Amino acid sequence: MYAVFQSGGKQHRVSEGQTLRLEKLDVETGATVDFDNVLMIANGEEITVGAPLVAGGKVTAEVVQHGRGDKVKIVKFRRRKHSRKQQGHRQWFTEVRITGISA
């Protein structure tokens, strides 16, 4: 059984027991989070696709940790001008473990 839900402007395909990183959520570590924006649920051969959401569909997850991703370097280089600009960015994330999918 798997589901596709939307969180942080992105769509995620998940199944029970899976761990994934989402955009930072404002919840405590160890808390339970319910995602109601379920776009599709597949249970064996039975597939339910929402228009746009599945009525009564819910994905439940437990927050494992919060953290920051790897550094991404941004470099702007102007050739022949003796000019260079460097910047770095680390995106905040929330790691969750999927505990249940219901339709």
UniProtKB/Swiss-Prot annotation:
A Pfam family annotated for this UniProt entry: Ribosomal_L21p
PROSITE patterns per record: RIBOSOMAL_L21
UniProt entry keywords in alphabetical sequence: Ribonucleoprotein, Ribosomal protein, RNA-binding, rRNA-binding
Matches recorded under SUPFAM superfamilies: L21p-like
Annotated Gene Ontology cellular component terms: cytoplasm; ribonucleoprotein complex; ribosome
The keyword rRNA-binding is annotated on this UniProt entry: yes
GO biological process per UniProt: translation
GO molecular function: rRNA binding; structural constituent of ribosome
Quaternary organization: Part of the 50S ribosomal subunit. Contacts protein L20.
Record NCBIfam families: L21 (TIGR00061)
Primary role: This protein binds to 23S rRNA in the presence of protein L20.
UniProt family annotation: Belongs to the bacterial ribosomal protein bL21 family.
This protein's name: Large ribosomal subunit protein bL21
Phylogenetic classification of the source organism: Bacteria, Pseudomonadati, Pseudomonadota, Gammaproteobacteria, Vibrionales
